[in-house]
Amino acid sequence: MLMVISPAKTLDFETPPTTGRFTQPQYLDHSQELIDQLRELTPAQISELMHLSDKLAGLNAARFGSWNPDFTLDNAKQALLAFKGDVYTGLEAETLSEAQLDYAQGHLRMLSGLYGLLRPLDLMQPYRLEMGTRLANARGKDLYAFWGTRISEWLNEALADQGDDLLLNLASTEYFSAVKRSSLKARIIDTEFKDFKNGQYKIISFYAKKARGMMSRFVIEERINDPEALQAFDVQGYRYNREQSTPDKLVFLRNIAED
């Protein structure tokens, strides 16, 4: 089973990594192509394109300017340990053992607007480039056009390396839209996490993102390769709901949201 998750806007390049092991991103030639284009933008243009404050636009202009694909532990960090959003709060990668990191390296991928597809131990430098950014480029009007079918092809390669054809989608709609379902040689399992609020079950973004991270960790800890085994996920009150689920869409409900 191969899992895909979204990246995060929040990054942590201050905390030392919990492992000294790392790999290099596999598709840096494509990243360099984007960086070359982004370097031509002024901070004001970055602000308008990405809807950022002047301060954040200036920060990311500087990041694009200093980006260097010769990644080391001195100028980069392992992707799974660098991202610090709600998904990664649920995943708690900093507490994974070396053996669990090994398993994650083979079974988890992070979608990325700049890097395309990252393995957990792939080094990355800080950036901000959401997949939904409408950055016109030589391949089309936005990043979906830029990546085209490449991400799907790379996922197919990763699945072939595993000898598997099962893809667990734990990414947001924005990011999984960069995966061309028709190009995947895989059975896709989608997930939904709903909390009870105001008399009904609904997807609450913060909780759903955290739950995707918790599900990722559950798969890593239990080394799950059977989709039916995913139904046992019961972390922090979530329970599989058979009535709302289908074989290819697993729905988990929780009656009391966390404070």
Swiss-Prot record:
InterPro entries: YaaA (IPR005583). Disulfide bonds: none annotated. It comes from the Bacteria. One of its GO terms (cellular component) is cytosol. One of its GO terms (biological process) is response to hydroperoxide. Belongs to the UPF0246 family. HAMAP family: UPF0246 (MF_00652). NCBIfam families: PRK02101.1-1, PRK02101.1-3. This is UPF0246 protein Psyr_1064. It comes from Pseudomonas syringae pv. syringae (strain B728a).
